Amino acid sequence: YIENDKISVCVDAVQVRDNLQLLGQNNVPEEWTDAVGTDGNLVNNTLSYIKSGNGIDSVDEIVKTESVKQKLVYATVTYTNKSDEEINHMLYIGTLLLMDHEDGSYQIYDPTEQSGDDYDRVIWDGVARTAEMTYNSISEDYGNGGNYISSLKPGESIQVNMAWIVNENDLNNMYLNLNGDGAAYEFSDSMLKTGLVDIYQ
């Protein structure tokens, strides 16, 4: 639950699914159309662990591959206008970020920048990604991206659905940022003030 002087935001539900049925037939983002297999479920994502070469004596090398399931994360969120004035063209944004938690401290990480003993980055062939939502249920032909609520009268609430496709092995470390700044790879002042939603609780 997040609020400021004008708007409050409440996460009503977060659902995790193997398919895109929650979106309906006509609302699937174009970049997700190839992510569904013949059985109707999301296809697996092939991760390739890369050892980078120096470009002179050695080239980039795939040291191992791994197949992981992709999952739909579907968040239902309610925005409420707490002010005395109508709010027009309200930008809304949800971002997922990944955090490690150890010894009381949290650190944001990018899964493509993970490294190990024999690799220094990870790439994959699926559509899985965190950061900004790929699907949103309410849009307005306004601004860049269309993720606007056209009007919210004083005291009025509106429910919005947002969705991402993610790698299943990242779910335990996934947090939802709804403060509107879109931060996903570093802590922002507004994020630290409003907090995050642990979606896997």
Regions found by a protein language model. Give the residues of each.
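Conserved functional micro-motifs across diverse proteins
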Residues: 1-201
